[in-house]
Each structure stands twice: as C-alpha cells, then as structure tokens.
Amino acid sequence: MLTDEYVKRVYAQVEKRDGDQPEFLQAVREVFESLEPVVEKHPEYEKAGVLERLVEPERVVKFRVAWTDDEGKVQVNRGYRIQFNSAIGPYKGGLRFHPSVNEGVIKFLGFEQILKNSLTSLPMGGGKGGSDFDPKGKS
C-alpha cells in the first residue's frame, strides 16, 4: 500500500495515462512500494522528478512486422521497441516474440530491464522489444 504523497501522486498519474496496460501498472506499483522508504528519506528526489523520469520511456516505437507464410500469403503483425533510460549508457534489452505481446507487456519488461541493468557494473540503459508474431511452427 502506497503511503507517501509524492509516490501516490506519481502512481495516480501513471494509472491515468497507462490504465490500459495492467502489466506495466503492476510492475510500477511493486517498484514504488519497494522504493517508498527511500523516497521518504530523500525529499530532493521529488524536486528532481526522479519517479516521473523513471516511469516515462524516452522512446516508444510501434511498427508493423510483415512476413510471408508457407502458402505465400503476406501476414502482418505488430512490433514494439520501448527505450526507457539511457542515463548510464545505451539501451540494452532483449526481444520477445509471442502472441500475447502488446505495448503494455513490452513497457513492463523494459521498465524492469532498467532496474536489472542498473545492478550490473556495466554502463547500460534499459529497453525491450518484441512482436505479437508467433515463431512456433513457422519455417
């Protein structure tokens, strides 16, 4: 449960803006719950807009993935690339190909990638890409 006013306010903004992305909202809430004690001890984070910058991607790219099936028919799927934070280095994050992929899923994975990458000693930012293309059974 979020108790800090700054954390609650930023989470409410995320809910309003990204309410159609439940995977992303869940990840943000869990991270905010973990960060809340630190944010309470450091009011300067609010002035610097740390949480606002953390949850807003630098770039969101949505594109089509066109391919030809075994019968020669052109199929079109959606692809996404979310680039969250390059403050400590270039974006690093893998690709996911699965029918369940949507913008919210890739946004959630990219958000978590920032935190994962920050735990390494390498200068890498966070990002993720993917498509709702299902590679299973394709030649």
Task: Show which residues each predicted segment covers.
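N-terminal ligand-binding/catalytic initiation module
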Residues: 1-139
